Amino acid sequence: GAGCCDYSHIAPAAQQRFKREVLTGQLTNHAQPSGVLNGFDLAIDLEEETLEPTLGWRTRVRLGVGPDGRAGMRKARSNDILADVACAQVIPGALEGIVGPDARTFTPGTEIIVVVDSTGQRHVVETAKAQRGRRVEQIETVIEGDLDATEIVPVDVAGQVQEFDYVFPPTAFWQAHRAAPATYSRYITDWAADEYEQATGWDLYGGVGLFVPSISMAMGGRPRI
């Protein structure tokens, strides 16, 4: 399905309630029996934070291309392409000329990746269709923009803000919500800040190294990561 687009018609407060129910259900069924949640009351201790904006926040999207060359989101549990209506969660302007009645056409059977980076630059690339459950990193054609997107993430530690630049292909994974990278980095610097006998941190998230600066700053600025 279209992921967040399927969810966008629901009021934000209701979305948050549904997500909380899903999360607490999973934790209760799968984590609680192990004992890792001992002393933790899911009804009281689970904190929530809503990232703004709640609509029009997605900075990157992967589209399918139908036999007629028109791009769009896929229907739920189907390979059919919805080419007439753009996803409501994509940031304004990202899909202009890409999806809709007057949009351009692309190579049938390919996938189109659209990214709007921190500088406001739109990148549109064409790739081969990915196999189910896999990501395609190879760019076949650059339609607009560059081979690399630039993301700038501010990290605040003890009132001092530093900005970190990340440059990587539009096909690489990055948090889709425009506010997510800075928010998640803030949680790491807040929760992980401490005095450590051995300054070694593990970024198990991987990717392009989004959390390396926040881990480093939380551990005193000179850890091994």
Identify the function of each model-found stretch.
Residues 1-225:
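Accessory RNA-recognition modules of RNA-modification enzymes
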